[in-house]
Amino acid sequence: MLWIMRFSGLFSAALVIIVLSPSLQSFPPAEAIRSSHLDAYLRFPSSDPPPHRFSFRKAPVFRNAADCAAADIDSGVCNPSLVHVAITLDFEYLRGSIAAVHSILKHSSCPESVFFHFLVSETDLESLIRSTFPELKLKVYYFDPEIVRTLISTSVRQALEQPLNYARNYLADLLEPCVRRVIYLDSDLIVVDDIAKLWMTKLGSKTIGAPEYCHANFTKYFTPAFWSDERFSGAFSGRKPCYFNTGVMVMDLERWRRVGYTEVIEKWMEIQKSDRIYELGSLPPFLLVFAGEVAPIEHRWNQHGLGGDNVRGSCRDLHPGPVSLLHWSGSGKPWFRLDSRRPCPLDTLWAPYDLYGHYSR
Protein backbone atom coordinates (compact mmCIF):
# COMPACT_ATOMS: atom_id res chain seq x y z
CA MET A 1 0.00 0.00 0.00
CA LEU A 2 1.28 3.39 -0.91
CA TRP A 3 1.01 6.31 1.50
CA ILE A 4 2.31 9.64 0.35
CA MET A 5 3.06 12.95 2.04
CA ARG A 6 4.69 16.04 0.61
CA PHE A 7 7.02 18.38 2.50
CA SER A 8 8.13 21.74 1.15
CA GLY A 9 10.31 24.62 2.29
CA LEU A 10 9.95 28.30 1.55
CA PHE A 11 12.76 28.45 -0.99
CA SER A 12 13.25 24.82 -1.96
CA ALA A 13 11.48 22.46 -4.31
CA ALA A 14 9.06 20.01 -2.73
CA LEU A 15 10.30 16.55 -1.83
CA VAL A 16 7.79 13.75 -2.33
CA ILE A 17 8.31 10.65 -0.18
CA ILE A 18 6.34 7.57 0.78
CA VAL A 19 5.29 7.49 4.42
CA LEU A 20 2.57 6.20 6.68
CA SER A 21 -0.22 8.66 7.38
CA PRO A 22 -3.55 8.24 9.14
CA SER A 23 -6.15 9.94 6.96
CA LEU A 24 -7.02 11.10 3.45
CA GLN A 25 -8.44 14.39 2.27
CA SER A 26 -9.27 15.27 -1.31
CA PHE A 27 -8.63 18.17 -3.62
CA PRO A 28 -11.41 20.45 -4.82
CA PRO A 29 -13.22 18.96 -7.79
CA ALA A 30 -11.75 19.11 -11.29
CA GLU A 31 -13.42 18.17 -14.55
CA ALA A 32 -12.55 14.67 -15.71
CA ILE A 33 -10.98 14.69 -19.14
CA ARG A 34 -10.54 11.67 -20.71
CA SER A 35 -12.73 9.59 -20.62
CA SER A 36 -28.26 -0.76 -30.29
CA HIS A 37 -25.73 1.49 -32.41
CA LEU A 38 -23.00 -1.14 -32.30
CA ASP A 39 -22.40 -1.37 -36.05
CA ALA A 40 -21.67 2.35 -36.19
CA TYR A 41 -19.23 2.14 -33.28
CA LEU A 42 -17.20 -0.62 -34.91
CA ARG A 43 -17.04 0.88 -38.40
CA PHE A 44 -13.41 1.81 -39.02
CA PRO A 45 -12.68 4.81 -41.24
CA SER A 46 -11.59 4.06 -44.77
CA SER A 47 -8.73 6.55 -44.95
CA ASP A 48 -5.17 5.27 -44.56
CA PRO A 49 -3.86 5.79 -41.02
CA PRO A 50 -1.09 8.34 -40.52
CA PRO A 51 2.39 7.06 -39.64
CA HIS A 52 3.27 6.50 -35.99
CA ARG A 53 4.52 9.64 -34.31
CA PHE A 54 5.68 7.96 -31.12
CA SER A 55 8.28 5.46 -30.00
CA PHE A 56 7.68 3.53 -26.79
CA ARG A 57 9.93 1.08 -25.00
CA LYS A 58 8.62 -2.43 -24.53
CA ALA A 59 7.13 -2.85 -21.05
CA PRO A 60 8.47 -5.50 -18.67
CA VAL A 61 6.54 -8.77 -18.52
CA PHE A 62 4.38 -9.05 -15.41
CA ARG A 63 3.29 -12.46 -14.12
CA ASN A 64 0.56 -13.58 -11.75
CA ALA A 65 1.40 -14.27 -8.14
CA ALA A 66 1.27 -17.86 -6.92
CA ASP A 67 -2.16 -17.48 -5.33
CA CYS A 68 -3.82 -16.16 -8.53
CA ALA A 69 -6.14 -18.30 -10.61
CA ALA A 70 -4.23 -20.09 -13.35
CA ALA A 71 -3.75 -17.73 -16.28
CA ASP A 72 -5.18 -19.04 -19.54
CA ILE A 73 -3.27 -17.48 -22.42
CA ASP A 74 -6.06 -18.30 -24.85
CA SER A 75 -8.92 -17.23 -22.59
CA GLY A 76 -11.35 -14.88 -24.28
CA VAL A 77 -12.96 -11.70 -23.07
CA CYS A 78 -15.85 -13.66 -21.51
CA ASN A 79 -13.68 -15.46 -18.94
CA PRO A 80 -15.46 -14.72 -15.62
CA SER A 81 -12.17 -14.49 -13.68
CA LEU A 82 -10.99 -11.40 -15.60
CA VAL A 83 -10.81 -7.84 -14.31
CA HIS A 84 -12.02 -5.51 -17.07
CA VAL A 85 -10.51 -2.03 -17.52
CA ALA A 86 -11.55 0.49 -20.21
CA ILE A 87 -9.29 3.37 -21.31
CA THR A 88 -9.35 5.70 -24.31
CA LEU A 89 -6.39 5.95 -26.69
CA ASP A 90 -5.60 9.00 -28.80
CA PHE A 91 -2.39 10.66 -29.95
CA GLU A 92 -2.58 13.60 -27.55
CA TYR A 93 -3.02 11.45 -24.44
CA LEU A 94 -1.33 8.25 -25.66
CA ARG A 95 1.67 8.71 -23.41
CA GLY A 96 -0.61 9.01 -20.40
CA SER A 97 -2.69 5.97 -21.37
CA ILE A 98 0.40 3.79 -21.73
CA ALA A 99 1.74 4.97 -18.36
CA ALA A 100 -1.65 4.16 -16.80
CA VAL A 101 -1.59 0.61 -18.18
CA HIS A 102 2.01 0.16 -17.05
CA SER A 103 1.12 1.27 -13.51
CA ILE A 104 -1.86 -1.10 -13.33
CA LEU A 105 0.23 -4.10 -14.38
CA LYS A 106 3.11 -3.22 -12.06
CA HIS A 107 0.93 -3.05 -8.94
CA SER A 108 -1.49 -5.86 -9.75
CA SER A 109 -1.09 -9.19 -7.93
CA CYS A 110 -2.69 -10.92 -10.92
CA PRO A 111 -1.67 -8.81 -13.95
CA GLU A 112 -2.33 -11.65 -16.39
CA SER A 113 -5.96 -11.60 -15.29
CA VAL A 114 -6.55 -7.97 -16.30
CA PHE A 115 -8.27 -7.43 -19.66
CA PHE A 116 -7.98 -3.99 -21.26
CA HIS A 117 -10.63 -2.49 -23.52
CA PHE A 118 -9.20 0.41 -25.54
CA LEU A 119 -11.51 2.95 -27.15
CA VAL A 120 -10.04 4.70 -30.19
CA SER A 121 -11.01 7.14 -32.92
CA GLU A 122 -7.66 6.69 -34.72
CA THR A 123 -7.11 3.21 -36.08
CA ASP A 124 -3.31 3.03 -36.19
CA LEU A 125 -2.85 2.73 -32.43
CA GLU A 126 -3.51 -0.99 -31.94
CA SER A 127 -0.15 -2.15 -33.31
CA LEU A 128 1.64 0.39 -31.13
CA ILE A 129 -0.08 -0.74 -27.93
CA ARG A 130 0.55 -4.41 -28.79
CA SER A 131 4.24 -3.81 -29.46
CA THR A 132 4.57 -1.98 -26.13
CA PHE A 133 2.68 -4.68 -24.18
CA PRO A 134 3.15 -7.89 -26.24
CA GLU A 135 1.43 -10.19 -23.74
CA LEU A 136 -1.42 -7.88 -22.75
CA LYS A 137 -4.98 -9.19 -22.90
CA LEU A 138 -6.75 -6.49 -24.90
CA LYS A 139 -9.32 -5.53 -27.47
CA VAL A 140 -9.53 -2.28 -29.42
CA TYR A 141 -12.89 -0.70 -30.23
CA TYR A 142 -13.34 2.01 -32.82
CA PHE A 143 -15.59 4.83 -31.61
CA ASP A 144 -16.96 6.86 -34.51
CA PRO A 145 -16.77 10.58 -33.56
CA GLU A 146 -19.82 11.27 -35.72
CA ILE A 147 -21.97 9.40 -33.20
CA VAL A 148 -21.73 12.32 -30.77
CA ARG A 149 -20.48 15.23 -32.85
CA THR A 150 -23.95 16.69 -33.35
CA LEU A 151 -24.71 16.28 -29.63
CA ILE A 152 -21.63 18.11 -28.34
CA SER A 153 -22.07 21.76 -27.43
CA THR A 154 -19.28 24.29 -26.91
CA SER A 155 -17.56 24.16 -23.53
CA VAL A 156 -15.39 26.36 -21.32
CA ARG A 157 -12.35 24.38 -22.53
CA GLN A 158 -11.87 23.06 -26.04
CA ALA A 159 -10.32 19.85 -24.67
CA LEU A 160 -13.70 19.01 -23.12
CA GLU A 161 -15.36 19.00 -26.54
CA GLN A 162 -13.35 16.09 -28.01
CA PRO A 163 -15.73 13.29 -29.10
CA LEU A 164 -13.60 10.56 -27.48
CA ASN A 165 -14.40 12.09 -24.07
CA TYR A 166 -17.95 10.83 -24.62
CA ALA A 167 -17.00 7.24 -25.52
CA ARG A 168 -17.56 6.14 -21.91
CA ASN A 169 -21.28 6.87 -22.44
CA TYR A 170 -21.33 3.97 -24.92
CA LEU A 171 -19.29 1.32 -23.10
CA ALA A 172 -22.34 -0.85 -22.48
CA ASP A 173 -22.96 -1.05 -26.25
CA LEU A 174 -19.33 -1.25 -27.34
CA LEU A 175 -18.18 -4.06 -25.05
CA GLU A 176 -19.36 -7.63 -25.44
CA PRO A 177 -22.62 -8.50 -23.62
CA CYS A 178 -20.70 -11.02 -21.48
CA VAL A 179 -18.72 -8.13 -19.93
CA ARG A 180 -21.03 -7.23 -17.07
CA ARG A 181 -18.75 -4.87 -15.16
CA VAL A 182 -15.89 -2.59 -16.13
CA ILE A 183 -13.55 -0.09 -14.48
CA TYR A 184 -13.39 3.08 -16.58
CA LEU A 185 -10.20 5.12 -16.18
CA ASP A 186 -9.04 8.41 -17.66
CA SER A 187 -5.69 8.59 -19.47
CA ASP A 188 -4.00 11.04 -17.10
CA LEU A 189 -3.58 8.87 -14.01
CA ILE A 190 -1.52 6.11 -12.46
CA VAL A 191 -2.65 3.30 -10.18
CA VAL A 192 -0.36 2.54 -7.24
CA ASP A 193 -2.41 -0.25 -5.65
CA ASP A 194 -3.87 -3.56 -6.75
CA ILE A 195 -6.63 -2.83 -9.29
CA ALA A 196 -8.46 -5.96 -8.07
CA LYS A 197 -9.38 -4.06 -4.89
CA LEU A 198 -11.22 -1.45 -6.94
CA TRP A 199 -12.80 -4.19 -9.05
CA MET A 200 -14.34 -5.76 -5.94
CA THR A 201 -16.29 -2.59 -5.10
CA LYS A 202 -19.80 -3.45 -3.94
CA LEU A 203 -22.29 -1.47 -6.03
CA GLY A 204 -25.45 -2.85 -4.45
CA SER A 205 -28.42 -1.48 -6.38
CA LYS A 206 -26.36 1.31 -7.99
CA THR A 207 -25.15 1.36 -11.59
CA ILE A 208 -21.86 3.14 -10.99
CA GLY A 209 -19.42 3.54 -8.12
CA ALA A 210 -17.02 6.46 -7.67
CA PRO A 211 -15.48 8.60 -4.92
CA GLU A 212 -18.00 11.34 -4.04
CA TYR A 213 -17.24 14.88 -2.86
CA CYS A 214 -20.32 16.19 -1.08
CA HIS A 215 -18.52 19.30 0.23
CA ALA A 216 -18.19 20.63 -3.34
CA ASN A 217 -20.41 23.45 -4.57
CA PHE A 218 -22.68 21.33 -6.74
CA THR A 219 -24.67 24.26 -8.12
CA LYS A 220 -21.70 25.59 -10.12
CA TYR A 221 -21.81 22.67 -12.54
CA PHE A 222 -25.05 24.00 -14.04
CA THR A 223 -26.19 27.36 -15.37
CA PRO A 224 -28.71 29.71 -13.70
CA ALA A 225 -31.10 28.77 -16.51
CA PHE A 226 -30.96 25.17 -15.28
CA TRP A 227 -31.66 25.95 -11.64
CA SER A 228 -34.45 28.41 -12.43
CA ASP A 229 -36.39 25.94 -14.56
CA GLU A 230 -38.17 23.17 -12.67
CA ARG A 231 -38.26 21.06 -15.84
CA PHE A 232 -34.49 20.69 -15.51
CA SER A 233 -33.64 21.14 -11.82
CA GLY A 234 -36.44 18.73 -10.94
CA ALA A 235 -34.13 15.95 -12.12
CA PHE A 236 -32.55 16.05 -8.66
CA SER A 237 -35.86 15.88 -6.80
CA GLY A 238 -35.70 13.24 -4.07
CA ARG A 239 -31.92 12.93 -4.42
CA LYS A 240 -28.99 14.34 -2.46
CA PRO A 241 -26.62 14.98 -5.37
CA CYS A 242 -22.88 15.10 -4.78
CA TYR A 243 -20.07 15.82 -7.22
CA PHE A 244 -18.08 12.84 -8.48
CA ASN A 245 -15.25 12.71 -10.99
CA THR A 246 -16.05 10.56 -14.03
CA GLY A 247 -12.38 9.73 -14.65
CA VAL A 248 -12.56 6.78 -12.24
CA MET A 249 -15.74 4.72 -12.22
CA VAL A 250 -16.77 1.14 -11.58
CA MET A 251 -19.72 0.49 -13.90
CA ASP A 252 -22.39 -2.21 -13.82
CA LEU A 253 -22.86 -2.63 -17.58
CA GLU A 254 -25.60 -5.21 -17.19
CA ARG A 255 -27.78 -2.77 -15.25
CA TRP A 256 -26.79 0.08 -17.59
CA ARG A 257 -28.02 -1.91 -20.60
CA ARG A 258 -31.23 -2.92 -18.88
CA VAL A 259 -32.19 0.65 -17.95
CA GLY A 260 -30.88 2.23 -21.17
CA TYR A 261 -28.72 4.95 -19.62
CA THR A 262 -26.96 5.77 -22.89
CA GLU A 263 -30.23 7.09 -24.31
CA VAL A 264 -30.97 9.03 -21.10
CA ILE A 265 -27.58 10.77 -21.31
CA GLU A 266 -28.14 11.54 -24.99
CA LYS A 267 -31.48 13.20 -24.17
CA TRP A 268 -29.77 15.54 -21.70
CA MET A 269 -27.15 16.37 -24.33
CA GLU A 270 -29.94 17.28 -26.75
CA ILE A 271 -31.51 19.55 -24.13
CA GLN A 272 -28.13 21.20 -23.60
CA LYS A 273 -27.93 22.07 -27.30
CA SER A 274 -31.16 24.05 -27.11
CA ASP A 275 -31.22 25.38 -23.54
CA ARG A 276 -27.57 25.68 -22.42
CA ILE A 277 -27.98 24.13 -18.98
CA TYR A 278 -24.27 23.45 -18.24
CA GLU A 279 -20.73 24.42 -19.31
CA LEU A 280 -18.39 21.51 -18.57
CA GLY A 281 -18.42 19.01 -21.42
CA SER A 282 -19.13 15.33 -20.69
CA LEU A 283 -19.35 15.56 -16.89
CA PRO A 284 -22.75 17.26 -16.29
CA PRO A 285 -24.84 14.63 -18.12
CA PHE A 286 -23.38 12.00 -15.78
CA LEU A 287 -24.20 14.19 -12.79
CA LEU A 288 -27.76 14.68 -14.05
CA VAL A 289 -28.32 10.94 -14.36
CA PHE A 290 -26.32 9.54 -11.44
CA ALA A 291 -25.50 12.20 -8.80
CA GLY A 292 -27.05 11.07 -5.53
CA GLU A 293 -27.28 7.51 -6.87
CA VAL A 294 -23.59 6.56 -6.77
CA ALA A 295 -22.08 3.72 -4.75
CA PRO A 296 -19.38 5.46 -2.69
CA ILE A 297 -15.74 4.46 -3.14
CA GLU A 298 -12.88 5.51 -0.87
CA HIS A 299 -11.26 8.80 -1.88
CA ARG A 300 -7.91 7.03 -2.08
CA TRP A 301 -9.05 5.73 -5.47
CA ASN A 302 -9.16 9.17 -7.08
CA GLN A 303 -6.69 11.71 -5.71
CA HIS A 304 -7.71 14.06 -8.51
CA GLY A 305 -6.93 17.63 -9.53
CA LEU A 306 -3.16 17.08 -9.68
CA GLY A 307 -2.94 18.64 -13.15
CA GLY A 308 -3.39 22.13 -11.79
CA ASP A 309 -3.19 24.91 -14.36
CA ASN A 310 -0.58 24.84 -17.12
CA VAL A 311 -1.16 28.48 -18.02
CA ARG A 312 -0.33 29.78 -14.57
CA GLY A 313 2.10 26.95 -13.87
CA SER A 314 0.35 26.11 -10.61
CA CYS A 315 1.18 22.84 -8.87
CA ARG A 316 -1.04 20.84 -6.54
CA ASP A 317 -0.12 18.99 -3.36
CA LEU A 318 -1.27 15.64 -2.07
CA HIS A 319 -3.14 15.75 1.19
CA PRO A 320 -1.94 13.34 3.88
CA GLY A 321 -3.42 9.88 3.75
CA PRO A 322 -3.52 6.63 1.82
CA VAL A 323 -3.38 6.90 -1.96
CA SER A 324 -4.27 4.18 -4.44
CA LEU A 325 -4.66 6.29 -7.58
CA LEU A 326 -3.16 9.65 -8.59
CA HIS A 327 -5.10 11.62 -11.19
CA TRP A 328 -3.70 14.61 -13.09
CA SER A 329 -7.13 16.01 -14.01
CA GLY A 330 -7.07 19.68 -14.90
CA SER A 331 -5.25 21.37 -17.76
CA GLY A 332 -1.69 20.45 -16.72
CA LYS A 333 -0.33 17.02 -17.67
CA PRO A 334 2.89 15.52 -16.23
CA TRP A 335 4.41 14.49 -19.57
CA PHE A 336 4.13 18.02 -20.97
CA ARG A 337 5.70 19.55 -17.87
CA LEU A 338 8.49 16.97 -17.74
CA ASP A 339 9.35 17.61 -21.38
CA SER A 340 9.43 21.36 -20.81
CA ARG A 341 11.71 20.77 -17.78
CA ARG A 342 9.24 22.59 -15.55
CA PRO A 343 7.68 19.67 -13.68
CA CYS A 344 5.59 19.92 -10.57
CA PRO A 345 6.92 17.89 -7.62
CA LEU A 346 4.21 15.24 -7.96
CA ASP A 347 5.02 14.72 -11.65
CA THR A 348 8.07 12.77 -10.50
CA LEU A 349 5.68 10.09 -9.22
CA TRP A 350 4.28 9.67 -12.73
CA ALA A 351 7.67 9.59 -14.48
CA PRO A 352 8.72 5.98 -13.56
CA TYR A 353 5.72 4.62 -15.48
CA ASP A 354 6.48 6.62 -18.63
CA LEU A 355 7.60 4.31 -21.46
CA TYR A 356 8.06 7.01 -24.06
CA GLY A 357 11.29 6.23 -25.90
CA HIS A 358 12.38 9.81 -26.57
CA TYR A 359 12.25 10.96 -22.97
CA SER A 360 15.60 10.89 -21.18
CA ARG A 361 15.87 10.70 -17.43
Curated annotation (Swiss-Prot):
Pathway: Glycan metabolism; pectin biosynthesis. Residues 22-361 are lumenal. Its main location: Golgi. Its EC number is 2.4.1.-. Keywords: Cell wall biogenesis/degradation, Glycoprotein, Glycosyltransferase, Golgi apparatus, Membrane, Signal-anchor, Transferase, Transmembrane, Transmembrane helix. GO terms for biological process: cell wall organization; pectin biosynthetic process. The chain crosses the membrane at residues 1-21. It is an enzyme of class 2 (transferase). SUPFAM superfamilies: Nucleotide-diphospho-sugar transferases. One of its GO terms (molecular function) is polygalacturonate 4-alpha-galacturonosyltransferase activity. GO terms for cellular component: Golgi apparatus; Golgi membrane. It holds the Pfam family Glyco_transf_8. It is found in: Golgi apparatus membrane. It is a single-pass type II membrane protein. Glycans are attached at residue 217. Coiled coil: none annotated. InterPro entries: Glyco_trans_8, Glycosyltrans_8_dom-fam, Nucleotide-diphossugar_trans. Belongs to the glycosyltransferase 8 family. May be involved in pectin and/or xylans biosynthesis in cell walls. This is Probable galacturonosyltransferase-like 7. It comes from Arabidopsis thaliana (Mouse-ear cress).
